[in-house]
Amino acid sequence: MNSVFYNPFGRGAYAQPPIAWRPRRRAAPAPRPSGLTTQIQQLTRAVRALVLDNATRRQRPAPRTRPRKPKTQKPKPKKQNQKPPQQQKKGKNQPQQPKKPKPGKRQRTALKFEADRTFVGKNEDGKIMGYAVAMEGKVIKPLHVKGTIDHPALAKLKFTKSSSYDMEFAKLPTEMKSDAFGYTTEHPEVFYNWHHGAVQFSGGRFTIPTGVGGPGDSGRPILDNSGKVVAIVLGGANEVPGTALSVVTWNKKGAAIKTTHEDTVEWSRAITAMCILQNVTFPCDRPPTCYNRNPDLTLTMLETNVNHPSYDVLLDAALRCPTRRHVRSTPTDDFTLTAPYLGLCHRCKTMEPCYSPIKIEKVWDDADDGVLRIQVSAQLGYNRAGTAASARLRFMGGGVPPEIQEGAIADFKVFTSKPCLHLSHKGYFVIVKCPPGDSITTSLKVHGSDQTCTIPMRVGYKFVGREKYTLPPMHGTQIPCLTYERTREKSAGYVTMHRPGQQSITMLMEESGGEVYVQPTSGRNVTYECKCGDFKTGTVTARTKIDGCTERKQCIAISADHVKWVFNSPDLIRHTDHTAQGKLHIPFPLQQAQCTVPLAHLPGVKHAYRSMSLTLHAEHPTLLTTRHLGENPQPTAEWIVGSVTRNFSITIQGFEYTWGNQKPVRVYAQESAPGNPHGWPHEIVRHYYHLYPFYTVTVLSGMGLAICAGLVISILCCCKARRDCLTPYQLAPNATVPFLVTLCCCFQRTSADEFTDTMGYLWQHSQTMFWIQLVIPLAAVITLVRCCSCCLPFLLVASPPNKADAYEHTITVPNAPLNSYKALVERPGYAPLNLEVMVMNTQIIPSVKREYITCRYHTVVPSPQIKCCGTVECPKGEKADYTCKVFTGVYPFLWGGAQCFCDSENSQLSDKYVELSTDCATDHAEAVRVHTASVKSQLRITYGNSTAQVDVFVNGVTPARSKDMKLIAGPLSTTFSPFDNKVIIYHGKVYNYDFPEFGAGTPGAFGDVQASSTTGSDLLANTAIHLQRPEARNIHVPYTQAPSGFEFWKNNSGQPLSDTAPFGCKVNVNPLRADKCAVGSLPISVDIPDAAFTRVSEPLPSLLKCTVTSCTYSTDYGGVLVLTYESDRAGQCAVHSHSSTAVLRDPSVYVEQKGETTLKFSTRSLQADFEVSMCGTRTTCHAQCQPPTEHVMNRPQKSTPDFSSAISKTSWNWITALMGGISSIAAIAAIVLVIALVFTAQHR
């Protein structure tokens, strides 16, 4: 504070120097900053600092302030009667003893509830690893919390692992159940309690505003104010502000649900891992050295522990050098340990091979959005010193000796047919998005000239989904896809590194006056090798003369300082220590994402009888897939461009088509047909011919044959009878013919020889006998027709109606998802109870065993090992598909990088092996063997006013319960599974495929690379690697190899099972299952609780009559009936159809004492005769239904026809009349023949 201002709250003003007295001038009043104003300003600054401090991720402890010294004041004059000095009271500015903060109310509440219900989990050393919770008769703890529960009764419990989440549980001892927590499924967005204070629930996430909590808190409960467990903590992720928690909660059904953040870290206290360096162990997170202090020893430490599980922890600790003194932090990451290099590019700017600073090592194109990940020999995002600088890059210059140079990122370009879009970069890696082309070129401008490197690789437009678009649309729909993560911090795996081998540098040797000198650069160690009579070698740091050598070509000089890693490239000589290797993280991992894809124009649909026509318009190639929903799916797939029309047949079982990225559409044929089933014979024949052409032709043909056969047989019988009766009289001259024979055979007793003569004789002499003769055949026909009419009900076969037994409550439900089945439970003494069962979903879940996973492989080509003046032997390889070969006489005398003194004895060891691709964790396929399947159904059951939804295994044994109701379902009437014995799962799609067994893979086919998991060490591969002899012009490792079988299978996998499965099954994974398969029927036994029944107190209709006003079959509730009734009183009555022919829409109606009610029903029958009951009183409805006008609908039929209702009464009448007449004629002829035989037999 400025001293010129007077502070009344502080010490007094400074004493003024003595001056002569003068009259005081009257000065203008100036603003006088008072002490109160100063305090207000200080208070404002304190509040602002407090608010900013609370907004940080974690609260920092307040800085310890020094106690202010008391200000000196002027001594006061002593008084005469001075009191003895008393103890001075503590002022505001005097230091006080720090007090332990008192827990808040929420924290005290949580501590009180946790006292006897939360238990500590400790390891063998007694350290707390996490916690377990006693809840609802179980002890629950996270699976990642290792150790033993610190409680005598719980220490020896056997835990069971959860099948879904990272949890395990054990049964709580009986004596402890009364002290267990209860849990709640209600999660309003309020504050909750836990051990460290308040937890906020908002937006579906639990967060800690204060940021407290960390390792060791896993397993702690989050409680509400009543003491019930809302969630169990698994871990957390730091956010600004606060901490986001990973928790396990419960839904309404009691099922556990895990909510986690993408950067969540498990909060179990990890066991410290130990690493090794020079036979000395140390904690991996606290290494004895770091890279900034001792680079050589640090690289040795990392190479020694390269396969340690805590290698990443050690690498992170080696990059940080903790010191007591606070220094300015410099950006340091793993690529600080590396250096750029010169790689052999096969096509440079001059179209010739050259050593390029931007050689392309590898290109990944696994992303679905067309983004490429490229590895080059330069390092992007670092300056010359190796410090992270996003706008710079460093590369190895082409001078002698090569030196690291620096450039701008803007000078680095990637081309295909046109320049690519640069998205992100880190170290050796860059991700770009390129236009189509047949090659990829990297370019770097160095001192005004362009350095380029080109490799052949076809780059095209990539698409995801069912439409081949070239550019992603602005609007469309979102579907899952694979993209490269553009943040630099995440890892996609490891890239192998090693220290560079010995490279001869000519500039380090100097020849002067017939003498040879070694001239190291400042600060470097140089190793020389000379062959001047004897072999000489050594390491020097200053200019040194080589005795006995006269020419510079007799020596080579090698830099001995290797404090940087380089990529394990086949273009570089391997280091002397051929086994020491390191590894660094590959940035930009492949991850699951959501991509925007176009939506094709909806097709024009035109329906016809049992057929459909689609008019399709596609601006780009669009996939159309179809299948039938019956037993024979007949799947089709076609890529369509332009405007086309496709026609498809539709069955009653259903038809499904999927156009582009639109959702699948299912349609069902209606039994619409021309003609009239209740009209004249030609209309009836026309109608049934369109519905059932084969059966109609068969029946008509059979009837025609029967009529012809009946007529022929009748004529033959009559002729035979007449001849047998007349033959004896014709052989006897002047024999008298009996009157009855004359009458029946139309025979003239005297001289009549013709039928006309006989009838004329009867007409002239006896007209009565003439009419009797004509009436006898007609009477026989009428009699036979009446007999057939009486026997007709016994000749027809009708299916029995489905009806619920009042005591067993057993029904058989068609396994048709989302199709309701209704029954009426009639129990003596109780009112009828409506029972409705709807199959919501039926799952066919097979038991599976994963044989292996396969993906694209990555061929590792280590730097070659060159042995001058000798040979080497191939080591025993433990890698997958390891191939090694030694080539002798490969490099000439003192050639290039080899620099060998021999001419033909030089050897090169080339080896290769295969490992899983870095993106295999995201992009891989599973080979799964399928075994016996179980069936599980989700049923919605409504009885009375109660509705329950249960999941039950359809095996006829396992019961399911919902409150007081018990249900047993199954077994399914048809054994069915859409899965073969072997299936492949890839990106959520399932394919029936006969894959090779584990260990029997073939090159270029599915299964050429096999592993039990993406992180397993049991990798098997067969990729047909053949090493070739290197050429003498440069160091390299040539080879040939079969293409990836995984990529070949992806391009030729065909349609997934979800597009080809019969019965409309929808195939899903996790777990593998087939949903909504409409196959077979489902026997169900329901035990309805007694409380659902009510004593008879409903109205009792005494008169019930059913009249069908209109009926259209094969439509959704296309029939209307009217029930006319008389009842003893008004009330609510249950109505039900007791036949599967018709289904009523309403389960109950309100009745008056007298009146009528209208109900709607659905039927598939032409002639629907069904029984309807109202409050126990039954009546029969007769409906003659007309065919529908629409041909297709979007839902399946609600009823099933039987034989008797499938044929109209009019058709039966015509059939009966026709067949009855023929049968009567044949019967009369047979009777006549029998009488004639009997008559003639008596006269023989």
Curated annotation (Swiss-Prot):
pH dependence, entry free text: Optimum pH is 7.0.
Location of the region described as Host transcription inhibition in the Swiss-Prot/TrEMBL record: 35-69
* Nuclear export signal, short sequence motif: residues: 149-159
**What ranges are annotated Extracellular (topological domains)?**
268-696, 752-764, 806-1218
**Cellular component annotations (GO), alphabetically ordered:** host cell cytoplasm; host cell nucleus; host cell plasma membrane; membrane; T=4 icosahedral viral capsid; virion membrane
Write out the ranges of the annotated region (Ribosome-binding): 103-117
Share any extra remarks: Belongs to the Old World alphaviruses that usually cause fever, maculopapular rash, arthralgia and myalgia. Structural polyprotein: Translated from a subgenomic RNA synthesized during togavirus replication.
Give me the ranges of the annotated region E1 fusion peptide loop: 890-907
Q: Where is this motif: Nuclear localization signal?
A: 62-103
* Positions annotated with a glycan in the UniProt record: 279, 525, 647, 945, 1051
Q: Which top-rank group of organisms is this from?
A: Viruses
Q: Where is this region: Disordered?
A: 1-113
Disulfide-bonded cysteines: 284-290, 481-595, 530-555, 532-549, 725-746, 855-920, 868-900, 869-902, 874-884, 1065-1077, 1106-1181, 1111-1185, 1133-1175
Q: Which residues lie on this side of the membrane: Cytoplasmic?
A: 718-751, 1240-1244
Q: What is this protein called?
A: Structural polyprotein
Positions of transmembrane segments: 697-717, 765-785, 786-805, 1219-1239
> In what ranges is there compositional bias, type Low complexity?
82-97
Which principal EC class is assigned to this enzyme? hydrolase
Q: Its Enzyme Commission number?
A: 3.4.21.90
